[in-house]
Amino acid sequence: MSLPWRIRVGDAADLDAVAPLWTAVHHQHMQVMPELAPYVSDDETWRMRRALYEALLAKPDTLLLLALLDDRAVGYGLAHILDRDETWVADTWVTGPRIGEIESLSVVPELRGSGIGSQMLDRLEAHLHEQGVGDLILGALPDNTDAVRLYERRGFRPTWLYLSRFSDRRDDL
C-alpha cells in the first residue's frame, strides 16, 4: 500500500520549509501550557531554533527528515548524537559512550495521528542505531499528553523532570 506522504532526508537548505513546522510546535507549547506565558514571538523562537539546527546539521551524525504531502512539508524530525559526558545522563545511569537525542519531531496539526510521526521516529531511531548508538533521549512538555503517550508507547520513559519558576508569571499555577 502506498502512503499519501513521503519522507526524505533534508539538510540546511530545507530549513525554510521547517520554519512553519517549528512554529506549529511553538504554538502547541503555548496551547498545552498557557500558564507559562509570556512566550517569545514566532520570529524569535524560529531565529533561535534555526541557529540550533544549523549548528547540529554541521555535524556529520545529525539527521533531518522531512515528511512531504504533495511536495508540501507536513512534518520533520531531527536527531543527533551527543557524547555521554555532554548530557545529564552520565552521572546517574550507565549508558554507552554516545547518546542519541531526538531533538525535534513535528507534524502539522491536521495530520497528527496519521502515522507520519511514528514513521519518522522509526527512521530517526534506525539512523541512530546504525551509528552504533543504543541509548536515546528526547524531551516533551509534560502537558503535551499526545506526544508523551506516543513516546511511551515506543518504550521511552520519564527519567528527569525539570521544574521551572519564571519571574513575572501568573501566580495561580
How would you describe each model-predicted region?
Residues 1-20, 24, 28, 35, ...:
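Conserved N-terminal entry element of GNAT/NAT acetyltransferase domains
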Residues 27-52:
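Conserved GNAT-fold acetyl-CoA-binding loop/helix
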Residues 47-65, 84, 101:
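A short helix-loop-beta-strand connector motif used in the catalytic cores of GNAT acetyltransferases and
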Residues 66, 72-80, 101, 106:
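Conserved beta-strand in the GNAT
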Residues 78-101:
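Conserved acyl-donor/pantetheine-binding loop and adjacent beta-alpha core of acyl/acetyltransferases
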Residues 104-107, 113-126, 130, 149, ...:
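Conserved acetyl-CoA-binding loop-helix of GNAT-fold acetyltransferases
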Residues 112, 123-124, 137-147, 164-169:
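Conserved beta-strand-loop-alpha-helix junction that forms the acyl-donor binding cleft
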Residues 151-161:
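Conserved acetyl-CoA-binding loop of GNAT-fold acetyltransferases
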